[in-house]
Amino acid sequence: MNFSIEIGPRYQNKKCDIFITEATFGLPIFSHPFDKDEIKKLLESVIKNNEKPHLIGVYALGKCQRILSLLRDAGYDEIIYLHGALMKITDYYVSEGLRIGKVKNTSDLNLSELKNQIILCPPSALHDKWSRKFKNPVVPLV
């Protein structure tokens, strides 16, 4: 589960008797920028580096769908490519009503036409042989 101090379209306030969580980055010493500001920076980078793909490491459950939604909310309507490990859970979110626009598996990506696509993948894929097929990618931190 992702936690956020920002209220968005996927925010749900749930009543519970006991709440147990692990929140490594929930301590007050961690100060996180606002999502919309980070998405704006990403989209500015896509425009500035329009000949390079952007590889973004995200977790399959929650973070991937959050980034997809934030990109769409910011007006990005191009195809967003997903690593195969992100497809199944994202398809489930879509079946439950999350509108994320057009996404495709990276296996459908024509590398010869690769320019300024946004490609989401698990963080571990950023450093394995899968990512080597993308020439000179931009790898922003999310």
Residue ranges: model-predicted function:
Residues 65-70, 92-93, 131:
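A short acidic (Asp/Glu
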Residues 1-53, 57-62, 73:
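His/Asp/Glu-rich metal-coordinating catalytic cores
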Residues 20, 78-89:
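Short internal beta-strands
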Residues 5-7, 29-31, 88-95, 114:
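Short, charged, surface-exposed secondary-structure boundary motifs
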Residues 39, 54, 78-81, 96-97, ...:
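The feature marks the mature, well-folded catalytic cores of soluble enzymes
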Residues 73, 95-97, 105-142:
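C-terminal regulatory/interaction regions
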Residues 18, 51-55, 79, 116-119, ...:
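Residue-level preference for the first positions of well-ordered beta-strands
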Residues 69-78:
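Short, surface-exposed basic-aromatic patches at helix termini and helix-loop junctions that form
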